[in-house]
């Protein structure tokens, strides 16, 4: 390497040439600014400078730094916590002294230690010398004191009188007596201790088996018992009781030890016999004796159980909690006898945050109560109604009762005449005469028993009873004129009887007329499903004449025979129950109801709950207007005292408490409006699908009326052919002529549609249609009627659902959005992309995600749809794994209506 000049070296190191020349001279090298400098000279200068500035020596000082970072979680406002970083810095400096200073410090420390040792030695010598002098002085004083005491004692002995021989003999005698007493007491104590030990051993042997059984039962209970800890008051009380019993068993009665007592007596006697016997020493002796007595008794009595642990009741005391439809947290806590906070904690464990006033549904409250170990009893809104109706007579004797018969038929076929003849012939003389009935029901006595007849003109009460689920009639008598045959109202009566499931007896009336043709009646009735016994059927046919009385007795015998087959029985004693046959509002008496008693005995003064009304029976009258005080089963009676007019068909029940009866009646009145509104929606064609029950065959009930018999048969056959496996057409009533009130009532009771072909409904029928919201339709073309019925049946079919693809977009690029996430830049290749429609994400023609759109934009604007051939940005909700090349498919679900 070429040599450099001093001037050039000065420029390289950043110093002036004069300063560098001066440093060279100090190092013993003489140079000028223009002289060259060799490498050896540079090294010589560097060594000089290091030596001058201490660079060649070892470092005398060292500094160490350390930094640690930790994170603390600090609670902030609003119950949220935040993290705070804490940084700790430490710095330590170590200084190394030179050897001279180290030697000087070591010498100083050594000199200081030698000085301390010399001082300690001198102090020890001085202390030993002082101790020796003090000991000598104390010995001299003690010797002088002893000499003085000996001198005083000798002087005292010389001065005191000598002890006499009698006193010495008395003292010896007392010592001998005391020794004898001690020996006797010790022997007695040993004997009692041995007896106590033997008693304890005997008790242990006797109770060993019982203790073993108790221990085994306790362990079994712990294994099989419910260890779920509850916070109920009953559980805590059970634990406290178990603890108290365990403590009582542990505290066995102690027998006082004779040894201990004698020892105490001897010690007390000894203490009293000498001075200071009642001092501190005497108290200590008594305390020692008590401790020894306790220890001996503890050893002599065997414990009942060696288990020293806490005895918690293994079986949880379960309380019965009654929960209604809804209950608040505070009410539930009160029923469970716990604090509301315990329920809130339990629900927090179950994942629900509630407050003390929050209302829980029945299912949630049941889960909470069962989780806390209680037995739950679910109650309904009408629980009071069930309780009132269930609080009746218990096990009572069931006896046969009279049949209840309803007479039906065409108005011109002699139904009224037949009723009048039976009444005139069978009612005993002397009663309120006349054939005018005060009420719509009466009973007659025959030689074979009693029969109760219901007069139901227009069949209104019968239909209303069946619609309300009340079966008041046991047998139906169908009156048919022998000279007139089957008429439309006769067919209606047959349909009513079949719908109610009531046995039917046919009374062929006017048999005394010359033009009577009973065989024609049998033939016509057989076409409607009523077959005579002579023809192999099940229906009894009786030929009667309401004018001459022919066949009346046979008819009554047939009724009683049918009742025997039915085996009609009822409770005769106890609280009554029945059904309202008819009711009215009398100007002078108020609400009046005719009740047919079905079981029990109705008495004057009973509390009656009758549908929406209630009241106390103030007066009772029979069918003849005669006041009575009680009525048994199958007896019609007129009662007064109800709060309002009940409806025909309402159930009348005797209850115990008038206040509860009023509560039930008010509850029923509040519920009546909802039930009525719900009933109005049943038979609408538009709501047929809502009435469908999955898995069951649907039925479309129809009441069909036509102008001529030919059209009626053609329509009925066509409608029956429409029935399928899923929907069935059920024509519950058909006939020729206009739509009557009976047809409307039957349609309302059966949830049917009234269909009229070239006929119309009368005023009374339209009134029922309006009040019951029955669907009424008129037709003049058969095909139009069939098409609309087919459409109605199609509406009852379960619909089909189909998914149609309405758009397809291809992902060209993916962008990231801080709010939404991955945004797919797409080109619409098919159809239209709609924001509200569900989507599928396809990758290599395989569906990998199905969801919905969160964002659809074109440029920066939110749009509702994007058409084919346009670009857009698509954000998929809850999905960020969209890649380039994916396809986004937009589809919609279309409901396909099924047709027959």
UniProtKB/Swiss-Prot annotation:
Disulfide bonds: none annotated. Its main location: cytoplasm. Residues 409-416 are annotated as: G1. Belongs to the TRAFAC class translation factor GTPase superfamily. Classic translation factor GTPase family. IF-2 subfamily. NCBIfam families: IF-2, small_GTP. GO terms for molecular function: GTP binding; GTPase activity; guanosine tetraphosphate binding; translation initiation factor activity. This is Translation initiation factor IF-2. One of the essential components for the initiation of protein synthesis. Protects formylmethionyl-tRNA from spontaneous hydrolysis and promotes its binding to the 30S ribosomal subunits. Also involved in the hydrolysis of GTP during the formation of the 70S ribosomal complex. GTP binds at residues 409-416, 455-459, 509-512. PROSITE patterns: G_TR_2, IF2. One of its GO terms (cellular component) is cytosol. It is found in: Cytoplasm. Keywords: Cytoplasm, GTP-binding, Initiation factor, Nucleotide-binding, Protein biosynthesis. Residues 119-158, 165-191, 198-229 have a biased composition (Basic and acidic residues). Residues 400-569 form the tr-type G domain. Residues 434-438 are annotated as: G2. Residues 509-512 are annotated as: G4. Residues 119-306 are annotated as: Disordered. The lineage of its organism: Bacteria, Pseudomonadati, Pseudomonadota, Gammaproteobacteria, Alteromonadales. Residues 257-272 have a biased composition (Low complexity).
């Amino acid at each position: 390497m070429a040599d450099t000049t001093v001037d050039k070296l000065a420029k390289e190191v950043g110093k002036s040439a004069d300063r560098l020349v001066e440093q060279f001279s100090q190092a013993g090298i003489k140079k000028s600014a223009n002289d060259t400098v060799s490498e050896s000279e540079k090294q010589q200068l560097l060594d000089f400078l290091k030596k001058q500035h201490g660079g060649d020596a070892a470092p005398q000082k060292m500094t160490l730094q350390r930094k640690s970072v930790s994170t603390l979680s600090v609670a902030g406002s609003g119950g949220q916590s935040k993290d705070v970083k804490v940084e700790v810095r430490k710095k330590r400096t170590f200084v190394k002294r030179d050897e001279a200073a180290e030697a000087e410090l070591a010498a100083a420390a050594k000199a200081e230690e030698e000085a301390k040792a010399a001082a300690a030695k001198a102090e020890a010598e001085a202390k030993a010398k002082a101790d020796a002098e003090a000991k000598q002085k104390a010995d001299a004083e003690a010797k002088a004191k002893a000499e003085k005491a000996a001198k005083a004692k000798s002087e005292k002995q010389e001065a005191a009188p000598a002890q006499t021989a009698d006193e010495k003999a008395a003292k010896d005698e007392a010592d001998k007596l005391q020794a004898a007493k001690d020996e006797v007491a010790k022997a007695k104590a040993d004997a009692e201790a041995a007896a106590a030990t033997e008693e304890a051993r005997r008790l242990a042997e006797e109770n060993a088996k019982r203790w073993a059984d108790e221990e085994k039962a306790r362990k079994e209970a712990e294994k099989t018992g419910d260890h779920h800890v509850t916070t109920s008051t009953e559980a805590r009380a059970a634990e406290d009781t178990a603890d108290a019993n365990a403590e009582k068993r542990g505290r066995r009665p102690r027998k006082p030890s004779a040894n201990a007592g004698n020892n105490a007596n001897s010690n007390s006697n000894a203490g009293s016999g000498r001075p200071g016997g009642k001092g501190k020493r005497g108290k200590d002796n008594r305390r020692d004796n008590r401790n020894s007595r306790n220890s001996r008794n503890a050893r002599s009595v065997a414990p009942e159980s060696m288990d020293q642990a806490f005895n918690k009741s293994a079986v949880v005391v379960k309380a019965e909690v009654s929960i209604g439809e809804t209950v608040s947290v505070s009410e539930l806590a009160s029923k469970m006898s716990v604090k509301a906070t315990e329920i809130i904690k339990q629900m927090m464990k179950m994942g629900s945050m509630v407050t003390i006033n929050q209302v829980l549904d029945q299912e949630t409250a049941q889960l909470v109560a069962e989780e806390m170990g209680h037995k739950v009893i679910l109650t309904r809104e009408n629980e009071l109604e069930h309780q009132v109706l269930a609080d009746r007579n218990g096990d009572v004797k069931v006896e046969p009762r009279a049949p209840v018969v309803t007479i039906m038929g065409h108005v011109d076929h002699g139904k009224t005449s037949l009723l009048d003849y039976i009444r005139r012939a069978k009612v005993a003389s002397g009663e309120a005469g006349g054939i005018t009935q005060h009420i719509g029901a009466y009973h007659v006595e025959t030689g074979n028993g009693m029969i109760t007849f219901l007069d139901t003109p227009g069949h209104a009460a019968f239909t209303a009873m069946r619609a309300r689920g009340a079966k008041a009639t046991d047998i139906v008598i169908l009156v048919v004129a022998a000279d007139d045959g089957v008429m439309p109202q006769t067919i209606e009566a047959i349909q009513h009887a079949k719908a109610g499931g009531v046995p039917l007896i046919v009374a062929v009336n006017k048999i005394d007329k010359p033009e009577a043709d009973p065989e024609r009646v049998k033939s016509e009735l057989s076409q409607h499903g009523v077959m005579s016994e002579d023809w192999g059927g099940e229906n009894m046919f009786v030929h009667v004449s309401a004018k001459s009385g022919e066949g009346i007795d046979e008819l009554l015998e047939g009724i009683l025979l049918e009742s025997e087959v039915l085996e009609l029985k009822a409770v005769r004693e106890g609280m009554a129950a029945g059904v309202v046959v008819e009711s009215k509002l009398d100007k002078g008496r108020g609400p009046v109801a005719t009740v047919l008693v079905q079981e029990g005995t109705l008495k004057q003064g009973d509390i009656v709950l009758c549908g929406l009304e209630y009241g106390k029976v103030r007066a009772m009258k029979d069918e003849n207007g005669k006041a009575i005080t009680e009525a048994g089963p199958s007896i019609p009676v007129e009662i007064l005292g109800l709060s309002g007019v009940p409806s025909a068909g309402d159930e009348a029940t005797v209850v115990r408490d008038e206040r509860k009866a009023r509560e039930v009646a008010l509850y029923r009145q509040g519920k009546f409006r909802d039930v009525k509104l719900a009933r109005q929606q049943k038979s609408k064609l538009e709501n047929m699908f809502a009435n469908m029950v999955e898995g069951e065959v649907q039925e479309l009930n129809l009441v069909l009326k036509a102008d001529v018999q030919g059209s009626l048969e053609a329509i009925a056959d066509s409608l029956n052919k429409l029935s399928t496996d899923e929907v069935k057409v059920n024509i519950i009533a058909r006939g020729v002529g206009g739509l009557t009130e009976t047809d409307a009532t039957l349609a309302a009771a059966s949830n049917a549609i009234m269909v009229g072909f070239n006929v119309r409904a009368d005023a009374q029928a339209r009134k029922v249609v309006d009040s019951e919201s029955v669907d009424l339709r008129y037709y003049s073309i058969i095909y139009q009627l069939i098409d609309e019925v087919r459409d109605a049946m199609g509406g009852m079919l379960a619909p089909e659902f189909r998914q149609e693809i309405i758009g397809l977009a291809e992902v060209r690029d993916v962008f990231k959005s801080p709010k939404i996430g991955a945004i797919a830049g797409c080109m619409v290749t098919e159809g239209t992309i709609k924001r509200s429609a569900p989507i599928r994400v396809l990758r290599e023609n395989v569906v990998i995600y199905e969801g919905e759109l969160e964002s659809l934009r074109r440029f920066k604007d939110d749009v509702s749809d994007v058409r084919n051939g346009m670009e857009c940005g698509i954000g998929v909700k809850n999905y960020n794994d969209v890649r380039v090349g994916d396809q986004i498919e937009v589809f919609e679900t279309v409901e396909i209506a099924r047709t027959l």
